[in-house]
Each structure stands twice: as structure tokens, then as C-alpha cells.
UniProtKB/Swiss-Prot annotation:
GO terms for cellular component: ribonucleoprotein complex; ribosome. Located on the platform of the 30S subunit, it bridges several disparate RNA helices of the 16S rRNA. Forms part of the Shine-Dalgarno cleft in the 70S ribosome. Coiled coil: none annotated. It comes from Thermosipho melanesiensis (strain DSM 12029 / CIP 104789 / BI429). The keyword Ribosomal protein applies. It holds the Pfam family Ribosomal_S11. This is Small ribosomal subunit protein uS11. Part of the 30S ribosomal subunit. Interacts with proteins S7 and S18. Binds to IF-3.
Length: 129
């Protein structure tokens, strides 16, 4: 007779943080929003895909708004009151996500644009005609 295997279920640890950092990475194809504690440990995250969108619609501001709403609700549920926002990338979901965090009742400390800009790094691709 085959041996029965037991599944081990890991329980989430209780997080006692009242201040968080929201990382918004917005590309042309998707927007990924991650909520971390000040040390950088991930608390929760969401994206256009987890909000239920597929394909090109993941890159829309509405998809970013719904993803930010999911993350903001989880943050409020965990007792986070104040957030700092770090925005990276050129996508269309940046402003929509920031507005959603304001509307959710979270106090916003700072908003920083941390988009990487090269100091004359790699040669860019040739222009399309």
C-alpha cells in the first residue's frame, strides 16, 4: 500500500508595521505594484494580470488602478497607515496607481521617480523608418 503524504501548509507571519513602501514598476505592457516594509521585505503585491486582465489590457491605466486597489485594501487590512511611493518606468499606469493609493485613505509621505537613466551607457537601437 502506498504511503500517504501530508501537506505542510506555511502560515503567513503577522506583520506589525504601520509604515510601508510601495514600488510601482510601470512598463508599456504591464504595471507591477509591490508593498514592502521599510527593510524591503515583500508584504503583498499585485499587477494588471492579477487584477484579471490579459494581453494588451494589462498595460492600461485602469488595470493599474485595480491592481493598486487590491494592494491598498490589503495594506489597510494589515494596519498600514503611511506609505512612501517609488515609481519606476515609462508606462501609462503610474499616475492611476498613485491616485488610487490617495483615494484608499493611505497617507502618502514621499513620491520618488527612480527610473534608471543611463549616463551614456549602451548604444541605442537604430531608429525605425
Amino acid at each position: 500500500m502506498a504511503k500517504k503524504t501530508r501537506r505542510v501548509v506555511k502560515r503567513k507571519k503577522k506583520i506589525a508595521v504601520d509604515h510601508g513602501v510601495v514600488h510601482i514598476k510601470s512598463s508599456y505592457n504591464n504595471t507591477i505594484i509591490t508593498l514592502t516594509d521599510p527593510d524591503g521585505k515583500v508584504i503583498t503585491w499585485g499587477s494588471g494580470g492579477t487584477a484579471g486582465f490579459q494581453g494588451t489590457r494589462k498595460g492600461t491605466p485602469y488595470a493599474a488602478q485595480l491592481a493598486a486597489d487590491q494592494v491598498a485594501k490589503e495594506a489597510v487590512k494589515l494596519g498600514i497607515k503611511k506609505v512612501d511611493i517609488l515609481v519606476k518606468g515609462p508606462g501609462s499606469g503610474r499616475e492611476a496607481a498613485i491616485r488610487t493609493f490617495q483615494a484608499a485613505g493611505l497617507e502618502i509621505g514621499t513620491i520618488k521617480d527612480v527610473t534608471p537613466i543611463p549616463f551614456n551607457g549602451c548604444r541605442p537601437k537604430k531608429k525605425r523608418v
